[in-house]
């Protein structure tokens, strides 16, 4: 990113740093990766993903705490032993997830992703059965939000990156209970927008959020799904205008979870689910997406062939000053039907690549 070399860039991740103590001792990562008692506690980066899911990353080793699933072999941790030996929280069963249960005396009990409490024995800390958890003191030694606020104060431009971990809280065998951002991300957004409203929200997510606060307080939002091998660089190039983003939403983004029926109701017609049957106001509709230019559709022509094939032709003109893709989407509605039909339904779409400013592309789409 040569364009950034002359810029004064400040970074803050907005995450708290914490230490753990138990029975008068600190908790630290041993040479074999296991969590053990120590005179001096290790500092951990606390990441909150919402719905009670936390991860803790050792500042010293750069690895995440987790409860191991496999039996010990050699120096590997035993079944359920708490250890920091993974550089990322990414697996089918993400054992780096912990839940934090506050106790009346101010301590906490940590539980693993299956809600088994963390307990201690002579070999270390474990979590693989229902038993009484050991009280642990979790002390915040650095407030991540306050550090981020100090970093953005007075800056010309701020990029605020929020979003999800693609395998925590929402995937096969896990359903979300909310459409909101994690509480700590909401708090960070509020504080950053208050201190420096010239902030662009960079959102990495595989599913919809309710973003009313961001829409009200920030001038722009740019979003990408996760999963690409060079995701950060691609997003940076889009933000810097090296290329123009031109994605489209593959899901409806609702204003509120109250607009959705019960999660076990699979009748999309009765429940008015998806863009095809939902008749309320949405945050962003299915197929929505902007880019760094604008387009006009001209010279429409529609003809019917063989009583079943619609042939649609049109010109797509770039009316702005930046080259970009456009995604032409054709929707249809059944005005008369003896059975319930969608309000509208996507019939066809085509991505037109890299239309230059002022130029146009002619399209013909056969649609059944």
Where are the model-predicted features located?
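Secreted, periplasmic, or luminal enzymes acting at the cell surface/secretory milieu
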Residues: 1-13, 204-325, 329-333, 341
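Short proline/glycine- and polar residue-rich coil/turn motifs
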Residues: 351-360
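Conserved small/polar residues in nucleotide/adenosyl-binding loops
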Residues: 361-367
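Loop/turn elements at helix/coil->beta-strand transitions in domains of secreted/extracellular proteins
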Residues: 154-158, 196-200, 217-219
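Active-site His/acidic residue clusters
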Residues: 164-187
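Redox-cofactor binding/interface segments in oxidoreductases and associated redox assembly factors
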Residues: 160-161, 223
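Lectin-like carbohydrate-binding module/patch detector with strong preference for beta-trefoil
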Residues: 2-155, 160, 172, 180
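Short beta-strand and strand-turn-strand segments in soluble, beta-rich domains
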Residues: 337-351
